[in-house]
């Protein structure tokens, strides 16, 4: 009898302990970012932001009383490493969802793994092929390049400019932009008169620009990330190129204005709204999220929050919403993610559906112009 | 007419880029001429020149001239330390081993600069404004004139030094025959050290004057170094003027290739011509073939 009582007591105690442990068990989320390597300008702010947001969610009591645990690995922008680390997250760490990777290459490489393991992935990379065609378990937060192209073409059409020259960088980003520029041109009644490229490390583009100056083009669209576009802006000023110059969202940061100096004046580009959050009209849906993110990032890292951090902010917040609505199982999270509608984030207002795992429209971009070393909205 | 205008612009742009290659090529040739080593860390000296100037300007708040002097001086010291620590201690090393060491050093320098100053590209303000100057229907920037000017000065300086000073002659003697130079009482070790010091200084100077045009970051040295190396090869790794012409030809070909044929194949065109030269005239474009005496 005495033995029975003690066993009952012991098992009761154990039961209590285990439920207590269960309640305290955090929800594990995996994160893969290219914190080092050539894409570190993406990965570093993304990691910072993801950790910042998770810490804050936990400080405010977690999701439905449970803390989030963010397990972050650095892919170094290397697809092979990304695959190994994704396997590690799925098999060893047993995460319920993964955010990142930072680059399109890394994301494409790990898609087969998450599809097989049936773990939802929210990629922070921009390539449209990540979610086209739609994969059951893959979502993304970064705006598609195609949306930026559409934003530029829309403006050109409004100004009745139909002949353009394009100058794109010969890397993945430029190739994707070039593809989109060519694919969408006909739809907006635009004719591409000259199609040139430059190398990512080139230091002089006057040859290409002299050729464009001699053509009938009414606008130049240049697709690249720093420092190439800054060189192009300076060369264009040197040559006295008189047609309007449009850049891509790849240079939508103050760094571009700093590098191009006076030559940046008058250049237009499609940008996510982070850049011009304080200029947005009061009724903009994203305004509250944007201002909160910028203030938060400023407090934590003494630097201006950018789009890249924004992609991670969106990924964590979308995940938080999905866990609240769909529970902590991978399948539940996936279904809740797909059902997300009108979520005002940093990159845009997200509405996922069974047919659209990118979730944004071209209104995610706003067209800005450089004036007096600062951005103004193009009306 | 339009085409003529364009071609003028291509040539002027090409010459401007080419003189950058020429200057970097020269600093390759200086070390090669006295040691027989191809210093693949040369591009890193160029990068250090630019990065250190920007650092002295923005963080130490020095005036431009002082910042440039500091940058060149510090890079020169780095060149000296590099020779002392990595080249000197290896007795009887083959040139191939030394070349591999310079590659290692270049990776090390690049990594350290990345850790110390970050990965961002930075721009140096132009020395005398950015108002374009018009020449025969084409335009160039005041900074291009600085580059032309400094290149000419460096060539003249090298000429005078190597042909008319005792140290310069001694350095040339080392490149012809180390052993004989040693026998006549030239301290070969000191001459090698000298060559690293001079070439680090020239490299840094090149880095400083091109930084306002090309901007600078921890990794600009790789491509610039490669192009400078091409210029030096075209010039036969020797005679000052040959390397300069090599650089100018390379720059002009790139620019004409990009403008007239296809910008996508710009580098391919330049490197194809480099290969042709290596096949047809391995001794360089402007050098007479050397005959080995037996």
Walk through the language-model features, giving the residues of each.
Chain A
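Extracytosolic ligand-binding ectodomains
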Residues: 2-9, 23-379
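Sec-dependent N-terminal signal peptides of Gram-positive bacterial secreted proteins and lipoproteins
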Residues: 11-17
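Sec/Tat signal peptide C-region and signal peptidase I cleavage site
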Residues: 17-23
